Amino acid sequence: MTACSVQHGTIRLERRYKAGPQRVFAAWAEPKARAQWDVPGRWVIAEQSFDFREGGRELKRFGPRDDPRFVADTLYLDIVPAQRIVFSYSMTSRGEPVSVSLTTIALSADGKGTRLLLVEQVAFLDGRDNAANREEGLASMLDKIGESLGA
C-alpha cells in the first residue's frame, strides 16, 4: 500500500470590480465570458463541458499549452443569480488525485461596483499541490475576471 497524506487549507480572496453584480455573475454564468478567465496565467483549456446550473456538472481538462494534464470535475450546489455561487470540485493530474474543494463565491453591491469574496476549503492529496500554489492560481483567475470586465 502506498502511503497517503492530506493537507487541509482555506483560501480567502477578495476583489472589488467596477462592474455591477449582474455583470460579474455573468462572467461565471456565460460560456464566452468565462472562457476569457477560467484558467490561471497563460494556461489553456483543452476540453470543457459547460452546465452552469444547480446540480450541473462540468468537466474541464486544462494546463500548460504543451501539457494540459489537469482535469477538474465540478458540481454546482447552490446558485443565486448576482449573489452567490457554491460548488465542489475534484482535481486530478494524469489520473492521480490532486485535491477536493468546496468553493463559495459571494457577490455584493459595492457602490456602483461589486465586492467578490471567494472562500475555498480544500483537501490537498498526497502532496500533489498546496495552498500557496492554489491561491496564486485563483488570484490570477480573479484578476483576469477584472480585466475581462474592464474593471
Residue ranges and their predicted role:
Residues 1-44:
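Hydrophobic ligand-binding cavity/cleft-lining segments
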Residues 24, 34, 58, 76, ...:
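Hydrophobic pocket/interface hotspot
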Residues 12, 32-69:
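Short beta-edge strand/loop motif at the mouth of beta-sheet-based domains
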Residues 21-22, 51-53, 77-84, 106-115:
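A short, structured loop/turn motif at beta-sheet edges
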Residues 15, 47-50, 72-78, 101-108:
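Hydrophobic/aromatic beta-strand elements that line small-molecule binding cavities or substrate pockets
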Residues 88-140:
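Beta-strand/loop substructures that line and gate deep hydrophobic ligand-binding cavities in soluble
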Residues 8-14, 21, 45, 57, ...:
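Intrinsic-disorder/low-complexity, polar/charged segments enriched in Ser/Thr/Lys/Arg/Asp/Glu/Gln
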Residues 59-81, 87:
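Helix-adjacent hinge/juxtasegments
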